[in-house]
């Protein structure tokens, strides 16, 4: 199984892969930082829009990055049998799903688990209302700009109070979170605030229209909350 994720190689350190039987059966595991995250070069783009038509070899998206990774692994990793599986949970589930678009022939099975697919509705807006605490708390740490390669997570945001409700009540207008706390350090926060409606910005980040003629076997895992 091959996991391609934005959370770093140590995001799930308590186990190797989704279950011990995979390791016992002799599977080879590869964990990769996605483009622009942690130790990978390039520019990280949140929910990078898929490009169904490429202008040339330099025109990339997460699907092409996954294709190239699988091509390299199957050509260079000793002992591999030329068959690859992918899985991911939450944001990593998005990367698992993108990998099965125009998939490499070696990709045989994919399991996106609680994956992001249409981010506007999946996480950031519930019944039309902006899900403020979730969005701010996540991006105030995860969304901080990277200054070169690194292995450590960004520090968590310190609210100055254990009462989260009171923190957001006291902050006043949404713009105050930018001017008082984020101060230009989180690009995606500014983009989300600038696009309160389901416009072209969000529609371009909807993965669902691109999940057509998927070749690998797929097991999607989800739940309710």
Language model features with spans:
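Accessory cap/linker subdomain of secreted extracellular hydrolases
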Residues: 3-18, 24, 46-52, 56-59, ...
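Serine-hydrolase catalytic-loop signature spanning alpha/beta hydrolases and amidase-signature enzymes
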Residues: 6-9, 29, 72
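Conserved alpha/beta-hydrolase
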Residues: 19-39
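Gly/Ser-rich "nucleophile elbow"/oxyanion-hole loop immediately N-terminal to the catalytic nucleophile
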Residues: 43-61, 68-85, 90
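Short beta-strand immediately N-terminal to the catalytic nucleophile in serine-hydrolase-like folds
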Residues: 86-88, 113, 221
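Glycine-rich nucleophile elbow surrounding the catalytic serine of serine-hydrolase chemistry
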Residues: 88-98
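Short beta-strand/loop motif that positions the catalytic acidic residue
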Residues: 214, 220-222
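Acidic catalytic loop of the alpha/beta-hydrolase fold
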Residues: 225
């Amino acid at each position: 199984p091959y996991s391609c994720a934005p959370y770093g190689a140590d995001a799930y350190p308590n186990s190797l892969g989704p279950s011990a039987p995979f390791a016992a059966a002799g599977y080879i595991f590869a964990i990769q930082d996605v483009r622009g995250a942690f130790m990978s070069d390039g520019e990280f783009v949140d929910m990078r829009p898929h490009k169904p038509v490429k202008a040339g070899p330099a025109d990339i998206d997460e699907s092409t990055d996954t294709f190239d990774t699988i091509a390299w692994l199957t050509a260079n990793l000793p002992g591999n049998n030329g068959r690859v599986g992918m899985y991911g949970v939450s944001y990593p589930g998005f990367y698992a799903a993108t990998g099965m678009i125009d998939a490499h022939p070696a990709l045989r099975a994919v399991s996106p688990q609680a994956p992001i697919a249409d981010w506007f509705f999946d996480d950031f807006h519930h019944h039309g209302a902006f899900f403020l605490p979730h969005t701010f708390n996540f991006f105030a740490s995860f969304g901080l700009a990277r200054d070169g390669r690194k292995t450590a997570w960004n520090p968590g945001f310190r609210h100055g109070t254990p009462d989260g409700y009171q923190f957001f009540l006291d902050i006043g207008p949404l713009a105050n979170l930018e001017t008082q706390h984020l101060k230009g350090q989180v690009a995606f926060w500014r983009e989300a605030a600038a696009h309160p409606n389901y416009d072209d910005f969000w529609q371009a980040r909807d993965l669902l229209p691109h999940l057509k003629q998927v070749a690998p076997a797929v097991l999607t895992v989800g739940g309710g909350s």
